[in-house]
Amino acid sequence: MGTRILDLLQLQNLTKRDPSAYKEEFLLQYQHYLTQLQIFQLKPTKEFKHFSQLVSYLSHVCVCYPKELSEFPKQISDLLENNCNNLEPELRRILAKSLILMRNRNLLPQIQMLSLFFKLFRVHDKPLRSLLYSHIVADIKNTNLKQKNQKLNRTLQNFMFTMMNDDSEIASKMSLKVMIELFRKKIWHDTKTVNVISNGVFSKNSKILITTLNFFLHIDNPDKPDEEEEDEAVKEKRAKDNFRKKSLAHRVGKKTKGRITRLAKSKVDLKKAKQEEDNKLQPNFPAIELIHDPQGYCDKLFNVLVKTTEKFETRIMIMNFISRLIYVHKLMVYNFYPFLQKYLQPHQKNITYLLAVLAQSCHELVDPDVLKPLVMTIAKYFVNDGCGSDVIAIGLNTIRSICSRCPLAIDTVLLADLIQYREKKEKGVAMASKSLLQFFKDNYPSMLPKKERGKNKTDIGLLAFGHQKVSQGIDGLDLLMDEELNARLDAIEAGEEFESDDDSDSDSDDEGWEDVNTTTADDDNNSEWVSDDDDEEGEEDEEVEDEEDEEEVDEEELEDDEEGDWESGEEIEGDDDDDEEWEEVEEEVEEEEEEEIKPTKKKSQQKEKVEVLRTDDIKVLTDEELIRIRKLRILKEARENNKQYEDMDQDDDENGENVHGLIRPEDLQGAHKKKKEEKLERIARAKEGRDGGYGSKASRRDKTGKSTTNEYKAKVTKPFVLTLKTKKVRGKSLKSFRDKQIGQREHSARQKRGRH
């Protein structure tokens, strides 16, 4: 070539365009790199700028010359592995980026590179660790994008599990973060990964312990979700709000074609958003269910909790994790409840959180004798007249949560005392006490005093400890057969009003009464409006009247015969015998009819049972049908309690106990007054709306991200010569002296008004 190329970036560009034409230049740079590498291996120095440029150039053009650069990836990986602690941080990152570039072009084996990157986690270089972490997660995700590569995953998992027990705490923590991220992205979503992560709670490093606890406690709602997940959540919320607005407008306003179209479109958008969310959360089970030997694991973790010297915030996280294990796997850790009892004081830090942990650890297999002291302690310290209203409300709500899971934990005397708080003036206390009363009134009214049990309340039966209620078939299966309830649910989901058959029947009955009242005027005129159905009904009525007339004639004949029988005693005795025989025959006929009716009722009931059993045994219910049964049950409860279906559904979703049986501390607080703000908080809130409210427009104008308007450019930046012919300038120059005086006076008057 005639010209000498000095810039490596320019040479890189030209080499990619025509590799054969620039092969001599490439070989020259490659020889230069080899000499620099030998010098660098003997004595790594700070003068690495030229060497890093050569490495970057060769990593970009290695695709063009695969034979000549076959040893280049191994040389860079060996240099990083042997001299990682002696290299400069910037050079380490350049070498790592070059390896990533070659791995993306399939010039480096994946297992070899990932094993090297995991070893580089030991280096005290935070930017390098973040670079390696992001690449490892992305590389494994792309490998398993189309289908699971089980062989590769097994090899990487085994290597990563050994890194969990590495001497370097930084490497162990980064390996743990990689596994958590891969599990959260549904890439390594298996029991092996979960059980390796679960061993992090026994680590002596506090950071590893807290990371593991956060994983198990917030697996369904991570602390820092991805931007894509946030966008999808916002999109689903926006679609749900839009559907509610359109359905309300359609239900309340006039039924126009445009509103119907907009409602249908909003329904389609909401369905798409829900499908995206369901596809994203396809494996929809928490990691806590995949732990091996949960009883032994929980006992071991409780021993760690008793002996630990961690901060109190970390200890209550361990308590929360143990309580979730106890509830999910129905464990018996009886030492855990007396351990919690010593924290049950109103002045205890994070007491609401601890009460939620206690209520969450209760289930039907826990011995009530273990929970009764806890309930008595809560009633003693939280539910008394000396405590504040917020404390009493929290105590009552906690007792209700415990009793909803283990109703035998409270005795009737204490229950009778607690329900008396419903007469208090404080709203939170009254609502909490009424909630406790309503729970026992709906489920176990026999535990309440007689005057509080209510009417038509059936006791579902308070089972003894260790007994379970065995259900036959699927609960609520009969609701799928209820046509009216299904039609009402379809109408609600479509955003339309539903008119029940009862209303139509009542309307028809009312119309019938009106017709009877109006027929007293003119029978002839009204007879013209009689329909064919009315004619048929009239014919049936005439037949019934004829039969009744015949019965009356027979009764009159019998009465005449009886009157004639009084004339002779012999005839009377004979007829009396006949009457007795007639009465006996009638009684026998009635008994036979009743016996015929009873078997038919039994047969119909047996048929209904057989039909239910057949649908349970033969037909496999789909997920959609199970979801519909749940919706129908909610709608039925809403109709019985005179509530709106939307409110019942929303309450069911917002209730913390319905999400994997968890209890949130906010659920125990109930209705409470808003806390009064302090002075500094009020000042800060008042200043929020004042930012940029004062000063000139130029100072308040956003300097970044916005361009100036043409009007502003014409006013400030335009040369005056170009504005001589404008209307504004010519108007000023052509003004008379009188007009100028008037304008000056108005200007001075405006200034004076502005001063005062």
UniProtKB/Swiss-Prot annotation:
Coiled-coil ranges from the UniProt annotation: 227-282
Annotated InterPro entries: ARM-type_fold, Sda1, SDA1_C, SDA1_MD, SDA1_N
Alphabetical GO biological process terms: protein transport; ribosomal large subunit biogenesis; ribosomal large subunit export from nucleus
Compartment annotation: Nucleus, Nucleolus
Function: Required for 60S pre-ribosomal subunits export to the cytoplasm.
Family recorded in the similarity comment: Belongs to the SDA1 family.
Designated name of the protein: Protein SDA1 homolog
Organism: Dictyostelium discoideum
